[in-house]
Amino acid sequence: MERAGAALCSYARHHWPQSHHWWIFVGPGNNGGDGYVLARLARRLGLEPLVIAARAPGLLRGDARRAADEWLAVGGEVMMADALEGASLPSPDLVIDALLGTGVQLPLSLPMTKIVATINGLNAPVLAVDLPSGLNADTGRAMGALVHATRTLSFIGIKQGMLTADGVDGVGQLDWDPLGVVPEAGLVPAAERLDYPRLKNLLFPRPRSAHKGKHGKVLLVGGNLGMQGAILLAGQACLRAGAGLVRLCQHPDSPPASLVQPELMGCPAGTDEGWATVRVLGPGLGQDEWGRAQFEHHLSRSE
């Protein structure tokens, strides 16, 4: 918790160096404990942190209780969230969301929903601690309400839910701090994030003498009437990803994609489907008789 608080303090000072009035919303668990540590460190630096609590410090337990007690021991004060409305306070120039962490599985309570709405309504940047409050860390779904952060500092590792569903809009700029946990700790990730640094190691420069026939052949099946754009976009994506040859098996009454992208070949009747290195079934396929027939035909021939 001390490491998390120190990481947050350093991160906030780096990204908002001119900020002075910090409103730190703390919850009932360890996420709130991180907020109390942050408040203590910020006070030591001469800043003016205002701690706004969803639960009274005396009702906390474990590490969160110790962090709250240490904040109070240095002269820090705690304002309850329900007393915030109508209070005459200096406006914050930075808001820290330390309400809820990774344990959110059920819709937020009404009091917590109101606090989230308050955070979202403040005219100041929001730093989320570990992940935005209200986000399911596994599914990425907002559990009734969700803090929309300007930036999120995640700890140990990035949570899968931050990159999916509502999490994409909630996290803002996403960064993470390992807090000293090294790969040798044996933590096994549940998913892998594909970003440019990772992908560039998979896409090697080709020799000038390279031949398209040696770089993979893709057969795309879809492009039903009215949905030709889906298979066209999929075909263009295959080309940009490096596929050497791409054929489109689309509805016979659809205009040929080669009118838009000459590199995309058609798939006339009698084409050897074993030609393809990989077969993609679905972009704009539809559920009519033609689409179902194509689905069954190609699925039965998949390896």
Describe each region flagged by the PLM.
Residues 1-54, 61, 151, 162-303:
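Small-residue (G/A/S/T)-rich helix-start motifs and N-terminal tracts that mark the onset
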Residues 58, 106, 143, 222-225:
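Short N-terminal micro-motifs specific to bacterial/archaeal maturation
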Residues 89-93, 146, 273-275, 299:
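A short, aliphatic-rich alpha-helical micro-motif
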Residues 9-99, 107-129, 254, 294:
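Nucleotide and nucleotide-moiety/phosphate-recognizing core
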Residues 75-83, 109, 134-137, 199-204, ...:
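Short gly/ser/thr-rich secondary-structure transition/capping motifs
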Residues 68-73, 145-146, 166-169, 258-259:
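Short, conserved catalytic or adaptor-binding loops enriched in Gly and charged residues
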Residues 85, 89-91, 118, 142, ...:
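Generic hydrophobic alpha-helical membrane-segment signal
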Residues 92-94, 99-190:
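Internal gly/pro-rich beta-alpha loop/helix module
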